[in-house]
């Protein structure tokens, strides 16, 4: 009988082969890969890459097949990902991205990005995403506030310096 590590290694190798190692990817490969990721997560629920790749594949299936059931499935697993991995910025950031890009809801995206930046290890790119979501949702004042907050943590960040200048200029009005 295989131990946990051997099973994970075999599952990941199979996923890699199906996803990247097959020249002519078959249409049915994504559902197979999704099921393999589910098996990986049964063995390793803290595997951020497996969660994020599986959710991305579900979103891709929703787009490619024009089948919203995949999108609802992706949302269900995105919420489960966060519930099982609440410590650290990464899951919050990913769910923010999910609601920003995959299942557009800027209010929810803002909420999750706000949670992500509370973590000290959140990279500057997470702050950039929050600023962009605020700006895109028409909340210029909030975007300005988050620029200032970002500059307090990352004082020389060129994106944020320029974004703040733009938002407070006549052009940004």
Protein language model features and the residues they cover:
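Alpha-helical adaptor scaffolds
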Residues: 49-129
